[in-house]
Structures are given as structure tokens and as C-alpha cells.
Amino acid sequence: MFTLSDFDFNLPPELIAQTALPDRTASRLLEVDGSVAPARLVDRHFAELPSCIAPGDLLVFNDTKVLKARFFGQKASGGKIEVLIERVTGTHTALAQIRASKSPGAGTTLRLADAFDVTVGERVEPFFTLHFPAPCLDLIEQHGRLPLPPYIEHDADATDETRYQTVYASNPGAVAAPTAGLHFDQPLLDKLDAMGVERATLTLHVGAGTFQPVRVENIAEHKMHSEWYDLPQSLVDKIAATRARGGNVIAVGTTSMRALEAAARSADEAGRPLAATQAETDIFITPGYRFRVVDRLVTNFHLPKSTLLMLVSAFAGVETIRAAYRHAIEERYRFFSYGDAMLLTRRDTPEAPGA
């Protein structure tokens, strides 16, 4: 049984990428094949991705768009607050985290961005319901700030507003970017199209829980955050066609992976084939999990002791990921959201009995 300590590693702080590279495809790409032993590691650049995949393969992208979900404001008493929108729940309502010296009660009015007032509604642990005076997506876009991850040490600027979004983002609702997709630009997508690689999209709105640390040594006790996803019938059809022609299903990012595997696991449990799905998922993928859909994964380098490091370890193999991360640190790859990428091939068999 793996414990939290099994997913720890020492990362020199200077390897945490603080800014995006000028060219999206200039990032490095570590190709990792966990289906062979010892694992095969190849140093590349992301622009070489087309040479790593085949015509007839299917790339699955998450088209969520990051909201300008961060606000500073004050209570009627003058006390300062910080608000992070977690999820838009209706035209005029959202769930949010609120940092304040004292938690506001229901009925409290909060002034945000010195521009408009919201009213606090019921508590939905650990969030607060906020009622907006106008469509909240409009107010968020007009007055909010882009919420960069906690390990990025500068406030979001105009460059971040472009580079912390994928070029294909179209469905507003995330509070963090699906960062594997940040490496794709339109010329690369056009090149993949021209060589006969299929593309499809799903939506999973990434929540702030993606940065939530695991606080228990026994990882089986960890409570995973929940996120909403939409897997359309067009994607289901493309997966079936890819399987029929012997192609690989390649998830672009762990969010695409989690949506695909959540839908497939639910279908398995119901005794039916994969189908279009709109649902919440709190799927927690750890070593021993049996992957049902995804053959390969494009992903960034993840934080020590994180659920995402556990996910990639389940996919490619614990020792394979350890070797890959050691190599990446030795070769000075850039880590986390603005960092470099990996292309992982699935380990053939799970490492231990699992879901």
C-alpha cells in the first residue's frame, strides 16, 4: 500500500516556472514510455509532438476557460476580504471561498473590486453562496482578476490573461487552467489536423481544490474535491471510431483524463457502454487503478505529494515516474503550470489491485 511519503521529492525552487515562455510550443517535452522496462525517456521539444503520435490517434482536450475569479473587497464595516469564486451555480449565484478576519454571516453585503455589491447566502462547506446583482459571469469578466496558482509569485498581468488560457478555451467556469493544453498553439493544432490526428473536446471546470494538499499519510483516507464535467456524444463516437481503427486515445491533461475515466467507470458500474455524461466527479486515481479509456497522456510536472502526481504514477508506474522526475530535475526541466510537459504511455498492468 502506497503512502503519502511515497510521492514526495525534493524540487529546487528555481525550477518552478514563474512565467510562460514567449512561444507556447518552445517548452520541452519528456517522452516517457512506461509500457517497457526500464522505462524509455526521450528529451524533446513540444513542437515535436506530431512525430510522437500517429494518424488516426485521438487527442482529447478540455475546453474550459479560466474565470477572472479573484476579487479583493470589503465588508460594510470596512474589514478587508479576499474572494475566490469556486463555481458559478446560476445566472446570479456562485460558490466562493472568502478570506476575512471573521466569516461573514448570511445576509451580509460585501463590496467587491469597489464596483458592485454581493449578498452572502447559505454556507455550503467550505464555500459561501454569493448572490450577484447582475449576471455573475459578466461581472467576473469585467471586474475580477485572473487567479494564478499559489506557487506563482507575481500578480496576474496582461500576459498571463493570454498565456494562462488555452487557445481553444471556450466554456467559462474554471478557476485554474488545464495546463497541459497551454503548450498548443493554432499552427501546431493545424499541423496535427493535416497529418490525420483526430481532435475532440470535453469540459471539466477545474476547481481550486486542484491545489488542495493531501494531509493524511494513508492516501486512502484523502477526501477528493468534486468537479463538474460534460462528456458529449460526439466524443463518445470518436473514441469508438478510434478504437475500431486501432488508434490511441490521448488525454491532453489530467482534467481530460479524470473526466474520461470517471465517465467510463460509471458506465462500467452500471453495466453499460460509455455514453454522453454530465456529472460531478470526485474520482481519485492512485496506483492500482484500472484505466478504461486513456492510452497516452500529455501532462505537466506536478507538485510533490499531490493527487496529480499519484494519478500519473498510477498511469505510467510509480518507479517510471520517479525515474522521469529525477531525470527532469537533473536536466533542469521547468515545473508546474508554466513549466514543461511530459508525454506518458500507459503501463500495461496496474501495480496493485484497484478500482
From Swiss-Prot:
Organism domain of life: Bacteria
A cellular component annotation (GO) from this entry: cytoplasm
Catalytic activity: 7-aminomethyl-7-carbaguanosine(34) in tRNA + S-adenosyl-L-methionine = epoxyqueuosine(34) in tRNA + adenine + L-methionine + 2 H(+)
GO molecular function: S-adenosylmethionine:tRNA ribosyltransferase-isomerase activity
InterPro entries: QueA (IPR003699), QueA_dom1 (IPR042118), QueA_dom2 (IPR042119), QueA_sf (IPR036100)
Location in the cell: Cytoplasm
Pathway(s) served: tRNA modification; tRNA-queuosine biosynthesis
Pfam families: Queuosine_synth (PF02547)
Keywords for this protein: Cytoplasm, Queuosine biosynthesis, S-adenosyl-L-methionine, Transferase
Keyword Cytoplasm: yes
Enzyme class: transferase
GO biological process: queuosine biosynthetic process; tRNA wobble guanine modification
Stored Gene3D superfamilies: QueA-like
EC code(s) of this entry: 2.4.99.17
Similarity remark: Belongs to the QueA family.
HAMAP family: QueA
Function statement: Transfers and isomerizes the ribose moiety from AdoMet to the 7-aminomethyl group of 7-deazaguanine (preQ1-tRNA) to give epoxyqueuosine (oQ-tRNA).
PANTHER family membership: S-ADENOSYLMETHIONINE:TRNA RIBOSYLTRANSFERASE-ISOMERASE
Known partners and oligomeric status: Monomer.
Protein name as catalogued: S-adenosylmethionine:tRNA ribosyltransferase-isomerase
Organism: Burkholderia cenocepacia (strain HI2424)
